[in-house]
Amino acid sequence: MDNEEVNEECMRLFFKNARAHLDKHLTSRLTCDENAYITFRCFLDGIHRKSTRFLEELLLKQENMYHNNNYERINDSVIPLVLKLLWLQIHEPTLQWFEHWFHDIMRLSNRRKFRVFRIFQKKMIQFFKITHRYYYDIIEHLCAKYDMNSVISNALFAKLNLMQYTDGLSTHEKIILNTSNPLTFSIVISLQRCVINLGSTHFYKTLLNKPSNKPKSVEGFEKSIRYLNIASLYLPAVGDTYFQRAKIYLITGKFSLYFFELVRGALVRIPSKCALNNLKDFILTPDFPERRRLMKKLAILVSKDLKGEKSFFEGQIVLQFLSIVEHTLVPQSWNASRASNCWLLKEHLQMAALKYHSGNINVILENLAATMGSFDLMFTTRKSKEQKNKLKYADLSERQVFFLDLSFDFIANIIDVVIKPSWQKNMEDFRYLAIIRLLMCWIKSYRSILQYTHRHRKFCTSFALLLNDLINSPLNCSGNIYSHRPKRSYLFREDIIFREFSCINFALTDFNDDYVYDSPDMINNIIGCPTLTKVLSPKEECVLRIRSIIFSGMKFLEKNDTGVIWNASKYKFDLISPNIKIKRQIALSEISSKINVKTQQERVVSSRKVEAKRDEQQRKRAGKIAVTELEKQFANVRRTKKLSPLPEKDGVSSELVKHAASRGRKTITGPLSSDFLSYPDEAIDADEDITVQVPDTPT
């Protein structure tokens, strides 16, 4: 085959035909006929050789274009597409066929079960090793051929045992990947796709490794999670990584983490359609299998009187929250027999959180992220993110305001009962203050939420009291308040967890991170593994978080309309009764020397200076490679269709209502077709010829 023949259409046709042949191989004969299995192995080897040839010819073709300065002809998406199609059309259907065979074996009598399982395990492990070796060979080939030191941290290569490829050939023997090289995007995406597929392959191996239906533990999926964590550090904007992790947490009954990973996978720069559809089903469809599984688990815990168990707390929190969101988004799906009083549900949720929160702060953080994601889903899905962010509070529908009422009542109680009494006793646990950082960045990302919270007295009061504690904490030197965002040299754990989260405009922005991104060590700084500066102790990181929250909080409360004012003489916020008309607000001059409060004219001038400085910073960074730049480019390449917005009715997508009524019972392992066109798949367009269908398994 000539180089010119290797294109997207050619590859799609090849894998479509290969899939048809695969379905003929995956029959009951494969389970008992050794010759049939040998034939299947030969077929698989042929597919791998053909796929490798595709990759080699495409790489050579694009390298020639690069050397000839013919950059405009380089196709960024075609090489990652080979790996995506190979997984969707060959490897994943085969692993799903093994999964169906496994479930058939579990229904056999014990004596026959173990005999058949030995046959099954031998063939499954053989397929696993072949698949695993294939993806690792591609990774090693790419690392041996390209110098990625400007793109990917050596810490990530070390996690993959690939350090020999970073120190081997001299620079002139490799093609250097950086911002100016148009090959960078394609190679980095391909590398990440291989790592995701390795994680997914280990998921199936662990799932099918023992002849038992006993519940699986998260620890058993350690290797799968390790690969997926590495993939999310490579490119956190790719939603498929989070969806694959969600599958693990579903299997192990970690519903809070399952919910959280679905939100992350659905609301990133390059979202996963499977994550989005499963998220909507989990929220809006009471009969969705995962909802029923959660109910069954809770019933077992209650029957065993294990209400104090952490798993009971997680399940109860998730279920109560799902009920609130469902009631808010699709109220017509409720009736009197299902406790239609949503405020009662809210009270149950708050009681559960406040009673069992000790040692479960991670569930609170995950629930906050789920709250953000649920609010995002309440908008017409064809409305752009920019439009959502610019909507005013007055433009919100009654349902959206109702949801915010429930959410911020709950958040205020969390601040009062969980964060305020406990953060000083748990300084080494980053999640207490991370909740506040995440909350403030969410509020300032939406104009409507910012205006709403400025009017929410309970929230402003709780937040002001927390700020008083932070300002007067021994960790805040001399009770300082700050006129600028604090600086740091690397991203903290919560920054890494929530990178590319669309609900906060893709990053926590309450620090001045110029040094993080302008440093020669940027690729290590953004994954929290700096090599040119020391890693701070938990206490030192806590001090910086306090400064960040104080700065953000002072700016936020400056415009509140709930009677919370700054008392400069006492150095704290005072709470004024809403029944007393305030004739004199505190003079801005009293605190202008302490915090960055300006007149309207000063704000305009300052804003222009900030924008000019930001443009200058971006120009300075033009010569450096930033992973986010690759992610933006990838998103733009794949969004091939522009969609016209539809009118919004009552602020909630009418499609959500249809979705709740029409969704069938689907499992998380199946690729769910999307009814929401504004969330394209992160790597390929949704064509019928790549739908994963599992062939029949033996009875």
Swiss-Prot record:
Any single biological process term in GO: regulation of telomere maintenance via telomerase
Compartments in which it is found: Nucleus; Chromosome, Telomere
Region of interest called Disordered, as start-end residue ranges on this chain: 641-663
InterPro entries linked to this entry: DNA/RNA-bd_Est1-type (IPR018834), Est1-like_N (IPR019458), Est1/Ebs1-like (IPR045153), TPR-like_helical_dom_sf (IPR011990)
Family named by the database record: Belongs to the EST1 family.
Complex formation: Interacts with CDC13 and MPS3.
Task of the protein: Directly involved in telomere replication. Associates with telomerase and during its interaction with CDC13, telomerase activity is promoted.
Name the record gives this protein: Telomere elongation protein EST1
